[in-house]
């Protein structure tokens, strides 16, 4: 569900967030319209709006864990976790975490990948939100959900800054809610 459809329609913060995201055509390869959130991070007001909207949504939901998907979920997750009094768990690509880890494989358009987390990072029945910068197919979020749920955690919702208008990945989330702040910008200009 898009934030504008959930009580924030017309909220100027959403426009500021959208305007702060740079679109880079043909990156990392031809035909891709890359949504560059590094420019959002350079705009301290838009970045604060992003965190504030997520915090407002989750502060009264008894969330005990914010899980961030590597790498850009790491940019938003810790700030949200601190503000709502939750711990932050990084969900990493293979070989990035020392010590004992558990993993979940998922399919990409061309190939496979895995997410890993430390054994014991999440406890059974802990309430979790998963944060990433963008959702397209939903494969990464689905793998993150499976990884956390395999340890007995309750995934309450997945949250992303950017989501495709026809969020194709929603069906991969097993009925879990998906909360998205803005649609990709600049697609009409380059298509």
From Swiss-Prot:
Annotated pathway: Purine metabolism; AMP biosynthesis via salvage pathway; AMP from adenine: step 1/1
CDD domains linked to this entry: PRTases_typeI
PROSITE patterns linked: PUR_PYR_PR_TRANSFER (PS00103)
Keyword terms: Cytoplasm, Glycosyltransferase, Purine salvage, Transferase
Substrates-to-products reaction catalysed: AMP + diphosphate = 5-phospho-alpha-D-ribose 1-diphosphate + adenine
Molecular function per GO: adenine phosphoribosyltransferase activity
EC number: 2.4.2.7
Cell location: Cytoplasm
GO cellular component, one term: cytoplasm
Knockout-associated phenotype: No visible phenotype under normal growth conditions.
Main location as per UniProt: cytoplasm
Family stated for the protein in its record: Belongs to the purine/pyrimidine phosphoribosyltransferase family.
Name of protein: Adenine phosphoribosyltransferase 5
Species whose genome carries this gene: Arabidopsis thaliana (Mouse-ear cress)
Record gene name: APT5
């Amino acid at each position: 569900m898009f934030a504008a459809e959930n009580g924030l329609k017309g909220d100027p913060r959403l426009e500021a967030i959208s305007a702060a995201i740079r679109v880079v055509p043909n990156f990392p390869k031809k035909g891709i319209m890359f949504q560059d959130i590094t420019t959002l991070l350079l705009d301290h007001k838009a970045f604060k709006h992003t965190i504030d909207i997520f915090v407002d949504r989750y502060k009264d939901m008894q969330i005990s864990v914010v899980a961030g998907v590597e790498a850009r979920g790491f940019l938003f997750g810790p700030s949200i976790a601190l503000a709502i009094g939750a711990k932050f768990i990084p969900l990493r690509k293979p070989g990035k975490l020392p010590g004992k880890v558990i993993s979940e494989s998922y399919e990409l358009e061309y190939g496979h990948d895995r997410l890993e987390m430390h054994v014991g990072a999440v406890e059974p029945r802990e309430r979790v939100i998963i944060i990433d910068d963008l959702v397209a197919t939903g494969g990464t979020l689905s793998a993150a959900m499976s990884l956390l749920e395999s340890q007995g955690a309750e995934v309450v919702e997945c949250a992303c800054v950017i989501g495709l208008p026809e969020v194709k990945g929603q069906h991969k989330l097993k009925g879990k809610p998906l909360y998205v702040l803005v649609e990709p910008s600049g697609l009409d200009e380059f298509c």
